[in-house]
Regions:
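Cys-dependent protein tyrosine phosphatase-like superfamily
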Residues: 59, 65, 70, 218-290
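N-terminal transmembrane-helix/juxtamembrane module of multi-pass inner/ER membrane proteins
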Residues: 1-76, 120, 130, 268-289
Length: 290
């Protein structure tokens, strides 16, 4: 195990890390169920809730046992908070969780979508897990997939800490979790890229180390930088408008949300945030999210 789990350099007593993680979990878990349930309730009160389904999705098989990896993200959600070497690490991971949950719930409320596939009856452990899931989850709260957003965050958190055989096993299990949102018929395809975008945004907003991209922001007085900021901001607005309007005709237009966010971040950099938004380290490498 020593060769498979990267050593964690403790910078403070681990007991403090556990307490901090427990406090965050005591807040995040109820917040999730309350806000997620509220969004579900609002959607259920609508006369009609739309859906985005590609024709080829009807060929996706229902694989009952994949509810197990689907559910496993709940375990890793809590364990990840404990897998930190200081309170700052806990705070940053919690910040990513909170970002994903808040943004996703806002989207669920403003743009509710519903899953259209009806699952067949299941028995045994899968049947039990589906029954528990159905006890609080409804066929709404689709895009962006909060499950995928949290998976991106949790996958990134563990991949920096595992070594040896555990690392490819982790990648494989993470793939199963990601695929399970389709094979359990919990989500439609478009929920995945939108959820991944949200997850990477949360990673960027709260990086593992270094300054936060929004810390110390001051509007620049440089005329050229302001002009460039406006130029990139305009590009972001146009891409966002293209995604919103294009989605009325073809859901593929929602992929424009990726360049829209990228352009917005560059505009933010020129406006005063500076080069730290690119999260480049001393050796020239950059974070996955940036």
């Amino acid at each position: 195990m020593a060769s498979s789990l990267a050593p964690i350099a403790r910078t403070e007593p681990y007991g403090r890390v556990v307490v901090r993680a427990a406090l965050w979990l005591a807040f995040l878990a109820p917040f999730f169920y309350l806000s997620y349930g509220f969004a579900n309730w609002l959607a259920s009160r609508r006369d009609e809730v739309g859906s985005i389904v590609f024709s080829w999705e009807h060929s996706i098989p229902f694989v009952a046992w994949t509810i197990v990896p689907y559910w496993s993200i709940n375990l890793f959600y809590g364990l990840s908070l404990l897998l930190n070497n200081d309170k700052q690490g806990v705070d940053r991971l919690a910040g990513r969780y909170l970002t994903a949950q808040v943004v996703a719930v806002i989207c669920f409320i403003l743009f509710p979508l519903t899953a259209t596939f009806v699952r067949p009856a299941t028995t045994g452990l899968p049947g039990f897990l589906f029954a528990v899931l159905g006890g609080f989850d409804k066929p709404f709260n689709q895009a962006p997939s909060l499950h995928i957003a949290l998976l991106v965050i949790i996958w990134d958190h563990w991949r920096h800490r595992l070594r040896g055989l555990l690392l490819p096993l982790w990648h494989g299990w993470s793939f199963l979790i990601g695929a399970s949102v389709l094979t359990t018929w919990q989500h439609h395809f478009i929920d995945i890229p939108t959820g991944a975008l949200l997850g990477f945004f949360a990673l960027w907003l709260f990086p593992r180390s270094g300054a936060l991209p929004f810390s110390g922001f001051r509007l620049t007085s440089d005329v050229k930088a302001r002009r460039l900021a406006r130029f990139y901001a305009l590009g972001a607005v146009l891409a966002l408008a293209g995604a919103a309007l294009g989605a009325l005709f073809c859901a593929v237009a929602l992929f424009l949300l990726w360049p829209a966010l990228a352009l917005a971040i560059v505009a933010f950099a020129y406006a005063g945030a500076g080069e730290k938004v690119f999260q480049k380290s001393a050796d020239g490498s950059i974070t996955l999210a940036s």
